[in-house]
Amino acid sequence: MTVHAKVKAAFVEAEKAVKVTVAPGFENDADANAQWGTTRALIRNMIEGVTKGYEKTMHVVGTGWNASMAGKNLKLTVGLANSIVMPVPEGLTVVVDKAAGEITPVKISGVNRQAVGQFASAMRAKRKPEPYNGKGIKYAEEVIKRKQGKQFGA
């Protein structure tokens, strides 16, 4: 991993820890302090990704809408004329649970937090949830604020 010039990262064998420090001469530099926090968070995310892994669950919601795996590609049938085929990036695992009903859960997992989030975001961007019928691709924990729609006979 490349580290900013104002930040030093080193593995301390005796403590079995990674120490991230601001380089000498830059202790009062606001940019160096910001880079220190970013570097520390990136290293923490790498360690957590290797030990526990990251997972996001997406829901494909809609009548007749579903997701399936076709080899190493995710195939989304979401109310368009053609199915959307998304290649799964290297290092990610996508599992589609075939559930009865209108919700199809899709689990995205991997060791790289950024890659998991980016693939989930790209999947959601194909068909964002809409507030009137609730159809779309959404995060499992996401709550869609519903709207009433037209009123007749005012």
Where are these regions (language model features)?
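Ribosome-associated RNA-binding proteins
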Residues: 1-154
